[in-house]
A protein has these predicted regions:
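N-acyltransferase acceptor-side catalytic subdomain
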Residues: 1-201
Length: 201
């Protein structure tokens, strides 16, 4: 199947229904903030290895977290008080931590310098956000993502201490409910997020 190349001077994307069986919609283009917002509004996101061209994805099925489906297990609920939490105070550091955290079955990271630079611009525009977990003032976990309408698009998380990222996620879910959000777009299915209550749609 032919995968279309994006025009650098045109922000439009193919329809997500035109993605190939792997979920790839297009390749090329750039990480212009306006293009990124247009992509996420269409259910499309960039995900590519360091030396590859930009690849744009819209997986089907994809993983979402309905806010009422989040499973706050007793052990995690007990550990929530171990941490203090902040929003949007160390966005770039959160991204860098997510980029350098070793992950099972993953060689390297897709969170490269260009991604960090582009999403930091979105953070400055009030579109990308971080939630951070601290112990005694030290950053020990957190996550980041994008706020698109009433959907939070979760990107990545890290934990230097057990449950630090899960706790940040639990606090995020609580606030998203208060703010009237509908769900978290988790994008690619993972067993970890499924264990917290996410489902494929």
């Amino acid at each position: 199947m032919h995968i279309p190349q994006l025009n650098k001077y045109n922000l439009s994307f193919p329809h997500p229904n035109e993605a190939n069986e792997d979920g790839i919609v297009a390749w090329g283009g750039d990480l212009n903030p306006s293009r990124l917002v247009r992509a996420y509004q269409s259910g499309i996101f960039p995900w590519y290895a360091k030396d590859d061209p930009i690849i744009w994805w819209s997986p089907n099925p994809r993983l979402i977290m309905e806010l009422d489906d989040f499973k706050l297990r007793r052990s995690l609920k007990k550990n929530l008080k171990k941490f203090t939490y902040k929003f949007d105070t160390k966005f770039q550091e959160i991204m860098q931590k997510c980029a350098t955290t070793p992950r099972n079955h993953q060689d390297g990271t897709w969170i490269n310098d260009d991604i960090i630079e582009a999403y930091t611009v979105l953070h400055g525009q009030g579109i990308a956000h971080s939630i951070e977990s601290y112990i005694d003032g030290v950053l020990v976990g957190g996550l980041y993502g994008l706020s698109i309408g009433k959907v939070f698009c979760g990107e990545s998380m890290f934990a230097d201490v057990n449950d630090a990222s899960k706790a940040a996620y639990a606090v995020l879910i609580k606030h998203l409910k208060l703010w009237g959000y509908e769900f978290v777009d988790c994008q690619v299915p993972t067993n970890h997020l499924k264990s917290l209550g996410a489902k494929e749609v």
